[in-house]
């Protein structure tokens, strides 16, 4: 008889930028690595490397000079299943060192994902990896489990996509979910672009990684953008140095807050979309008038692109300006929000009430991929 510990469910949050994977019941993911697959530019150049045809995650990053990179997930949706399969293979066998056929696997997906995407995910889990049981849960429902609040409005912003998801009594309200194809990767691109104004050029995918690092270390959100710009003209207090991998040191100033400002003003990068504050407001306004007070009073931030210092205060200020004046606005930025979707999945997969959500291999064999729409919410 297998030990209960051996059948811990695996939880895999496949982000556009990073894969977060680990075991249900843990409080943080064991493996966090970039969602990239690199292939050698020229076959046969790497002598004695025992030439692999593909490298995944950190290994692809460390060999960046000789590989071309691909991101199999764009805007939260898988666009290259062969590469995605490589990422999952790497997750199970190299990172977690488990045999997927012995575990239930919980995968997360972006809300409003195409149905075919969800079917294909399930199919690969059963047919390629022979998983014991699988389930797909929408990212936000998972984030809610971590927040433990009955009614909340979740703003989840990752690398490829942002969503606002109102949650009431533990359920996401699908009619009010709004999707914004603006997230971390766009901010990285924008930072690279405004750095060219200073005469620095970052164009290759490897250089973009340096810019991402700079963004994560130095960017912040201004409470008042115009005021911050004025301040920069008269003082150098905003300026910070950043050392590039080759030892060159560059100085950045206003770029630090001009970069994530795009979240509030997408028009800066030519996007005709509402900012994250307005999208959150629109999403709340799509809900029943009786629950809006609860949603305004519990706006929960989640995902890596909500990690910028100053985001909660700015969000609070912007939503207060949009909402009725009597409304009490509270923006919550939990410290573990970078992994809140994964943590929520970990909690969810270990709940006894979740056990009926798993799709067993036998059910899949009988009904085919479409079973995923009946069982997963």
UniProtKB/Swiss-Prot annotation:
One Gene Ontology CC term in the entry: cytosol
GO biological-process terms attached to the record: cell division
Localization per Swiss-Prot or TrEMBL: Cytoplasm, Cytoskeleton
Superkingdom, taxonomy of origin: Eukaryota
Keyword annotations from UniProtKB, A to Z: ATP-binding, Cytoplasm, Cytoskeleton, Hydrolase, Nucleotide-binding
The keyword Nucleotide-binding belongs to this UniProt entry's keyword annotation: yes
Predominant place of localization: cytoplasm
Signal peptide: none
Catalytic reaction annotation: ATP + H2O = ADP + phosphate + H(+)
CDD domains from the UniProt entry: ASKHA_NBD_actin (cd10224)
Gene Ontology molecular function terms on file: ATP binding; hydrolase activity
Enzyme Commission (EC) number: 3.6.4.-
Function description: Actins are highly conserved proteins that are involved in various types of cell motility and are ubiquitously expressed in all eukaryotic cells. Essential component of cell cytoskeleton; plays an important role in cytoplasmic streaming, cell shape determination, cell division, organelle movement and extension growth.
Remaining remarks: There are at least 13 actin genes in potato.
Family listed: Belongs to the actin family.
Protein name listed in UniProt: Actin-75
Organism this protein belongs to: Solanum tuberosum (Potato)
Gene: AC75
